[in-house]
Amino acid sequence: MAHSHSHADSHLPKDNNARRLLFAFIVTAGFMLLEVVGGILSGSLALLADAGHMLTDAAALLFALLVVQFSRRPPTVRHTFGWLRLTTLAAFVNAIALVVITLLIVWEAIERFYTPRPVAGNLMMVIAVAGLLANLFAFWILHRGSDEKNLNVRAAALHVMGDLLGSVGAIVAALIIIWTGWTPADPILSILVSVLVLRSAWRLLKDSVNELLEGAPVSLDINALQRHLSREIPEVRNVHHVHVWMVGEKPVMTLHAQVIPPHDHDALLERIQDFLMHEYHIAHATIQMEYQMCHGPDCHLNQTPSGHVHHH
């Protein structure tokens, strides 16, 4: 049998990415604090709910910035994959905090239906418009001259763009209160914004838990990959012991491949590596080639019967 371990060289993030993320984080975090103060002073729950949404933006920007900074640190003997998993842990903690905060806001909104409180619509409007402008500015900072291949910056920009809807919700609530004096618009809009935050937080929680538990990327069908590999490379008779997990943004894979004894081991290994790289963008793979069928009790430990591929 033969082993092969390959990985593509990681390129250091550009400094301009870190600067843009830092500027966007400062703007977003600053206006988040302004919305908290404005929400307390005006009595607007919609502003507080939108501040919670901006908290998700600030956290996403901070995590992206941490990835840029920590990815510059080389792996060590104790941390062989570097420090990328730290951002996943922070995302997990942040997601739990967001769920708790959002549920508290929803509870407060329900209470306000029964015990309405006065809302300063004009102050609420000023703060909400400022928050909207902050989101637009942060999105512009991230989008201008952005590196389309930088997933961190792209994800952060999309996250900020999603928060624009929350700011619009607070503005709509303020307009209704100013024009009609109907204060229930505030808790109604705060609940709608909270639903958006919960949706984002729940997705973040699921993704972070999946990565912390070293789950396979949800976009990758391991059984389909096994069939595809055996179909594209005839020398591969069976693929088993397939494990895929994420380290930061990069997928890592190990697999066993039962192959017809090749004349050139290195050439076959290179073909398998090229297949994984070009078809599935997996640049970091450890491949064990075997000449005999796997007969151990754990041969199909991590695959369904449909994933068992055997060519006669």
From Swiss-Prot:
Subcellular location: Cell inner membrane
Record keyword Ubl conjugation present: no
Record GO cellular component, one term: plasma membrane
InterPro entries linked to this entry: Cation_efflux (IPR002524), Cation_efflux_CTD_sf (IPR036837), Cation_efflux_TMD_sf (IPR027469), CDF/SLC30A (IPR050681), Zn_transptr_ZitB (IPR023500)
Key words of the record: Cell inner membrane, Cell membrane, Ion transport, Membrane, Transmembrane, Transmembrane helix, Transport, Zinc, Zinc transport
Principal localisation: membrane
Domain of life: Bacteria
Gene3D superfamilies attached to this UniProt entry: Cation efflux protein transmembrane domain
Membrane disposition: Multi-pass membrane protein
GO molecular function: zinc ion transmembrane transporter activity
HAMAP family: ZitB
NCBIfam families for this protein: CDF, PRK03557.1
Function: Involved in zinc efflux across the cytoplasmic membrane, thus reducing zinc accumulation in the cytoplasm and rendering bacteria more resistant to zinc. It may contribute to zinc homeostasis at low concentrations of zinc.
PANTHER family found in the cross-reference section: CATION EFFLUX PROTEIN/ ZINC TRANSPORTER, RE54080P-RELATED
Protein name: Zinc transporter ZitB
Species this chain originates from: Salmonella typhi
Gene, per the UniProt record: zitB
